[in-house]
Amino acid sequence: MDGQPTCPLSISVRSEDFDIAAEIDRIGKNRREIGAIVTFTGLCRDEDGQLAALELEHYPGMAQAEISRMAKQALERWPLNGLTIIHRYGLIKPGENIVLVVAASRHRHAAFEAASFLMDYMKTNAPFWKREHLADGTAGGWVSSKEEDEESRKRWEEPRKSE
């Protein structure tokens, strides 16, 4: 499916938090052709009450370039009218935002698929590394990638039915 080369695209890799409502407004304000805006917000979670913070490290130029590459693939696959991707780095506490994907399109299917595609690829391909900082003051280990994340990404590599 042809992407729209004039689609507004915003990619940010930063330490500062983001305002989800402001990002939705930025992509959709005064845009009457948009019929759907899908957002995904990834949060830092503490599954067992032991996590004080998650430290995200990255290669500055490489992270932005890889996310841009993934965004361009999404724009080629789905007819999007706007796309915003924000990924944070640094020390992030449980409950705080880590990543935001806002995908806008004329129809919901394209927006949902693009957001899902981008998250599946960012979980496995974006050059970010996570290390736990525990509530008792000790440094936890590096967080390994999960097999289910790899499986989710692989589904996008399978031949697609017409969309």
From Swiss-Prot:
Stored Gene3D superfamilies: Molybdopterin biosynthesis MoaE subunit (3.90.1170.40)
Catalyses which reaction(s): 2 [molybdopterin-synthase sulfur-carrier protein]-C-terminal-Gly-aminoethanethioate + cyclic pyranopterin phosphate + H2O = molybdopterin + 2 [molybdopterin-synthase sulfur-carrier protein]-C-terminal Gly-Gly + 2 H(+)
Region of interest called Disordered, as start-end residue ranges on this chain: 138-163
UniProtKB keywords: Molybdenum cofactor biosynthesis, Transferase
Binding sites annotated in the UniProt record for substrate: L43, C44, R45, H107, R108, K123, K130, R131, E132
Pfam families for the chain: MoaE (PF02391)
Alphabetized GO MF terms: molybdopterin synthase activity
Biological processes per GO annotation: Mo-molybdopterin cofactor biosynthetic process
Keyword GTP-binding attributed: no
Pathway membership, UniProt: Cofactor biosynthesis; molybdopterin biosynthesis
Keyword Cell membrane: no
Enzyme class: transferase
Compositional bias (Basic and acidic residues): 151-163
The enzyme's E.C. designation: 2.8.1.12
Function description: Converts molybdopterin precursor Z into molybdopterin. This requires the incorporation of two sulfur atoms into precursor Z to generate a dithiolene group. The sulfur is provided by MoaD.
Family, as annotated: Belongs to the MoaE family.
Subunit structure: Heterotetramer of 2 MoaD subunits and 2 MoaE subunits. Also stable as homodimer. The enzyme changes between these two forms during catalysis.
Listed name of the protein: Molybdopterin synthase catalytic subunit
Organism: Brucella melitensis biotype 1 (strain ATCC 23456 / CCUG 17765 / NCTC 10094 / 16M)
